[in-house]
């Protein structure tokens, strides 16, 4: 489906359940698409929970550009996209996320969008080799539950867990999270189940809790109750 925004048209691939418990909206990295293995794993995790899942191609990518340009303009367009998707599913909680640059957008706009939680795959903490240019503030800006899944060898860095931000570090992989589809599906599925239904999954390695992190895929990631050329 096409979605008009002030920045131009976007498109969304929508898997819509009849009576979904939540809406999961996902988007790509700076120069990527919505069919990356990690986004497809997150999509399947949402479908496993009965969600409506939208994978959004942002306006700049639909125009053929590989760099998103102004963050403010990108965020404005994202909020228009999410608002129009939410009108199709009134009263349903929103969980939004993405990979790399898409994860940044999801964090920056979470409050304004009214998101219950954010999924950040391969969050680019800093440009490669430039740790002084940290984007950790964007994670905190979400103001809600955030699940970060990063590769241990990611040249864009690995965020620290803090507050409502959980971080899972997958060994043996970098920014693409290659070969981790199964682990991502399990992690995201357990996280979504607890967020939306309050299911109590088994304890993950390291006893992951709010403001903590764990290395390895683990069986689950429980949040607190109550609630290349990918440019980053």
Describe these PLM feature segments.
Residues 2-93, 105:
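Serine-hydrolase catalytic machinery in alpha/beta-hydrolase-like enzymes
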Residues 142, 148-150:
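Short beta-strand/loop motif that positions the catalytic acidic residue
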Residues 181-212, 216, 228, 232:
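Catalytic active-site module of serine/aspartate enzymes centered on a nucleophile-bearing elbow/loop
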Residues 155-160:
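Conserved alpha/beta-hydrolase "acid-adjacent" motif
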Residues 58, 120-128, 151:
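Active-site nucleophile loop of the alpha/beta-hydrolase fold
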Residues 98-102, 106:
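Gly/Ala-rich beta-loop-alpha elbow adjacent to hydrolase catalytic centers
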Residues 173-183:
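Catalytic histidine-centered segment of alpha/beta-hydrolase-like enzymes
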């Amino acid at each position: 489906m096409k979605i008009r925004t002030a920045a131009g048209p976007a498109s969304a691939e929508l898997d819509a359940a009849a009576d979904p418990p939540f809406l999961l909206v996902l988007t790509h990295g700076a120069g990527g698409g919505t069919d990356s293995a990690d986004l497809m794993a997150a999509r399947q995790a949402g479908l496993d929970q009965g969600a409506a899942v939208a994978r959004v191609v942002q306006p700049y990518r639909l125009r053929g550009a590989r760099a998103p340009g102004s963050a403010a303009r990108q965020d404005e367009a994202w909020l228009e996209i999410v608002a129009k998707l939410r009108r199709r599913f009134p009263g349903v909680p929103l969980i939004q996320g993405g990979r790399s640059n898409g994860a940044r957008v999801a964090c920056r706009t979470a409050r304004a969008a009214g998101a219950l939680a954010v999924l950040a795959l391969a969050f680019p903490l800093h440009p490669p080799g430039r740790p002084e240019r940290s984007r950790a503030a964007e994670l905190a800006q979400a103001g809600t539950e955030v699940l970060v899944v990063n590769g241990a060898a990611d040249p864009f860095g690995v965020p620290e867990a803090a507050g409502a931000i959980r971080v899972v570090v997958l060994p043996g992989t970098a920014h693409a999270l290659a070969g981790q589809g199964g682990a991502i599906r399990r992690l995201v599925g357990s996280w979504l189940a607890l967020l939306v239904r309050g299911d109590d999954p088994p304890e993950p390695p390291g006893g992951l809790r709010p403001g903590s992190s764990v290395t390895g895929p683990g069986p689950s990631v429980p949040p607190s109750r109550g609630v290349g050329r990918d440019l980053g």
